[in-house]
Amino acid sequence: KGVIFSCIAAIFWGLPQPLFFNELNHVETIEVVAHRGFWSFIFLFLLLILISNISDFIEIFKSRKRIFILTITAFLIAGNWAGFIYSVGQERVQDASMGYFITPMISIVLGYFFLNEKITKPKFASVCLMLSGILFLFINLNQFPFLIIWIGTSWAIYGLLRKQVNVNPS
């Protein structure tokens, strides 16, 4: 069931976004990211007031470490959005796709080094195969794959840091 819902979410989330952001290619990336952040904040704040426990929200701000990590993750996700929106606006959707494609590989490596997660033989084989394919693609590019690396790395580091912070989902 989870795989089916994951595929449905990917279709509804992944397909419309490049089409939507392509229509905004005349607007500066930073402005689109600022609007996305601002309106997300407004929407989530209203949602918090309507259906959540305010004390859980206030609890987040009782730890400096938690605030620090959440601030870093906010900048990482904003930078990731900027990379995605910029790549779509520059008609480099494949760079964005490749960035998100390499994210699991980067996440596995980060988990191994920072979370002491074990890499099973199948995971190791898949990382090696993916790495060889990516290196082949990178070698054949005419330019340094900055956007690909930025999108994949910023998303993976965001995931790693968010895993370090316990925030009540209510």
Where are these regions (language model features)?
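Hydrophobic/aromatic residues within transmembrane alpha-helices
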Residues: 23-24, 32, 36, 87-88, ...
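C-terminal transmembrane-helix exit sites in multi-pass transporters
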Residues: 86, 103-123
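Glycine-/small-residue-enriched transmembrane alpha-helix faces in small-molecule transporters
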Residues: 1-31, 128, 132-164
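Hydrophobic/small/kink-forming positions within alpha-helical transmembrane segments
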Residues: 11-15, 74, 78-82, 104-109, ...
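Structural motif at transmembrane-helix junctions in multi-pass transporters
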Residues: 26-31, 82-99, 169
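Membrane-interface interhelical linkers
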Residues: 1-8, 42-71, 121, 168-170
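Residue-level recognition of pore/gate-forming positions within transmembrane alpha-helices
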Residues: 37-41, 101-105, 127-130
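Specific transmembrane alpha-helical segments of multi-pass solute transporters/efflux pumps
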Residues: 57-94, 136
